[in-house]
A protein has these predicted regions:
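Mixed-charge, low-complexity intrinsically disordered segments
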Residues: 50-91
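Active-site acidic/histidine clusters and adjacent loop/turn architecture
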Residues: 1-41
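Short loop/turn and capping residues at structural boundaries
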Residues: 41, 63, 136-138
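Short aromatic/hydrophobic-glycine micro-motifs
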Residues: 28, 34-35, 57, 130-134
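Catalytic cores and adjacent binding grooves of peptidoglycan-active enzymes
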Residues: 79-151
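Short, charged/polar surface micro-motifs in flexible loops or helix N-caps
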Residues: 44-47, 57-59, 106-108
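Stable alpha-helical elements in mature extracytoplasmic
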Residues: 12-19, 48, 118, 122
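Acidic helix-start/capping segments at beta-turn-to-alpha-helix junctions
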Residues: 35-54
Length: 151
């Protein structure tokens, strides 16, 4: 699991940098309380994808075993183990063609529950640089997710 732009497929690295620069420079986002953006994940190993996919599909103890096997150091509550966070084993993250980003508040903390307008603005800006945004997915919205459209 990586957070580095350099671990993305070379075809989308420049777009990732430009997207983050544009997000950080956007006055509408600044006025909404966004101080910056954190890359949560870029390229992902299959074991990590399988662990994510197990959530909501396996018993809590088995989900935790999947997380341990993937090397994910995260303590999950029983409720979290039963909450699906992906619908696929074929994520664009596996090929380095996706990244998850989250806004940061002025206190430096990730703003996972930012208002919808923040996520929609992020989507609009990112789409201008060639990304498809999970914000717009009807069946399973994934607000932090951006995947390269050229792939």
């Amino acid at each position: 699991m990586s957070r580095k732009i350099e671990d993305l497929d070379p075809r989308c690295q420049d777009a990732a940098r430009k997207t983050l620069n544009a997000l950080n420079a956007d006055d509408e986002l600044k006025n909404s309380g966004v101080a910056g953006w954190l890359i949560v994940e870029t390229r992902r190993e299959l074991a990590v994808q399988m662990a994510y996919f197990s959530r909501g599909r396996m018993a809590p103890e088995h989900v935790r075993m999947m997380y341990d096997a993937a090397g994910i150091k995260q303590q999950l509550s029983d409720k979290e183990t039963q909450t699906a966070i992906t619908t696929t084993l074929k994520s664009k993250h596996l090929a380095g063609l996706a990244m998850d980003i989250v806004p940061i508040k002025a206190d430096g903390k990730a703003w996972w529950d930012a208002p919808t307008r923040v996520w929609m603005r992020m989507a609009t800006i990112a789409e201008g640089f060639g990304w498809e945004s999970g914000v717009r997915w009807k069946d399973f919205p994934d607000y932090p997710h951006l995947q390269w459209r050229g792939a």
